[in-house]
Amino acid sequence: MASHKLLVHPPKALLKPLSIPNRLLLGPGPSNLAPRIMAAGGLQIIGPMSKDMYQIMDEIKEGIRYVFQTRNPLTLVISGSAHCALEAALVNVLEPGDSFLVGANGIWGQRAVDIGERMGARVHPMTKDPGGHYTLQEVEEGLAQHKPVLLFLTHGESSTGVLQPLDGFGELCHRYKCLLLVDSVVSVGGTPVYMDQQGIDILYSGSQKALNAPPGTSLISFSDKAKKKMYSRKTKPFSFYLDIKWLANFWGCDDQPRMYHHTIPIISLYSLRESLALIAEQGLENSWRKHREAAAYLHGRLQALGLQLFVKDPALRLPTVTTVAVPAGYDWRDIVSYVMDHFDIEIMGGLGPPTGKVLRIGLLGYNATHENVDRVTEALRAALQHCPKKKL
């Protein structure tokens, strides 16, 4: 028998059926799910340490190696968003007092600075205005001056729409005995990245962008150089949950019997497995081409409306997330709200430094189609006609 009376009654809202609006997600992520990926989310759960689950985990690792273009044995999934993957990289590689060089040309570089400082690293931001990118010469100056153990670059800066070139940076870092960490959250699956050939030591991505899986899992891979640094550290990582030695064992990366570490998000991993399977069936190069062609079509339609792309150099435009300069006289919030309220299409404003300056339109995975470009540009045309415009 219960010894106390209930003080909290069943919430009335939970006694009603769950209702989800039918909405087209054309922001920087998450993206709408393909039917096969949605179906995977409805499958029955199995034990996290069963042979069947281990098989699924191994298939996911092979899929990650494919989309990352790597043969690294130390390749796995982090149970958490891409922020978790970034923290996993930093908490395992950096020790207090280590020098950490960060390309801070948007919100994700700023987050890397914040996390590095929390870990007691000596953080050296290379700050750029929104829309900027890094050259080999600029990075070499930072490497020579600060002698870091780790350099962070964002491949696809979704807050600014910049695609950071990666060729040559791995070789440059290794010349200075520095590891290269790359954020590819919004780029993997949507634009070329070659982890091994570009000399990237740690690469991570998210499930909910061009890969089209639900949010909540992140992909990460470590080179042998990165593994050596992590496995020879003098102090334990601050986080047990993100300790790579435990995670490597649980994901079958160390050729040892697997030991329980935490309960993985089983249903989310079903969906991730299917998202990687779809890219494998489509072909990675075909996926890149689809995103490139959809982005080019979007850029042309936007410019036909008289809108200006925020990133001026076409070679530096991220194909998965396009940033559009907010047209003079308009409040970006009015445009975003109009497109949502009248067309059930989600686009987003800026994040971090570009807040108030840009609109962000994502063409990610399943959503990267000419039909969706037509829908969002017609919605923008209507918004520009009906939203209030201040006199300049």
From Swiss-Prot:
One MF term in the entry's GO annotations: alanine-glyoxylate transaminase activity
A biological process term (GO) from this entry: glycine biosynthetic process, by transamination of glyoxylate
Gene3D superfamilies (alphabetical): Aspartate Aminotransferase, domain 1, Type I PLP-dependent aspartate aminotransferase-like (Major domain)
InterPro entries in alphabetical order: Aminotrans_V_dom, Aminotrans_V_PyrdxlP_BS, PyrdxlP-dep_Trfase, PyrdxlP-dep_Trfase_major, PyrdxlP-dep_Trfase_small, SP_NH2Trfase/AEP_transaminase
Catalytic reaction annotation: L-serine + pyruvate = 3-hydroxypyruvate + L-alanine; glyoxylate + L-alanine = glycine + pyruvate
SUPFAM superfamilies: PLP-dependent transferases (SSF53383)
Cofactor(s) needed: pyridoxal 5'-phosphate
Claim: Acetylation is one of the keywords in the record: yes
Record localization: Peroxisome
Sequence positions bearing N6-succinyllysine: K225
Residues with N6-(pyridoxal phosphate)lysine modification: K209
Motif (Microbody targeting signal): 390-392
The EC number(s) this enzyme carries: 2.6.1.44, 2.6.1.51
Record-listed N6-acetyllysine modification sites: K225, K234, K312
UniProtKB keywords: Acetylation, Aminotransferase, Peroxisome, Pyridoxal phosphate, Transferase
Family as reported in the entry's similarity comment: Belongs to the class-V pyridoxal-phosphate-dependent aminotransferase family.
Main function: Peroxisomal aminotransferase that catalyzes the transamination of glyoxylate to glycine and contributes to the glyoxylate detoxification. Also catalyzes the transamination between L-serine and pyruvate and contributes to gluconeogenesis from the L-serine metabolism.
Protein name, UniProt field: Alanine--glyoxylate aminotransferase
Annotated source species: Pongo abelii (Sumatran orangutan)
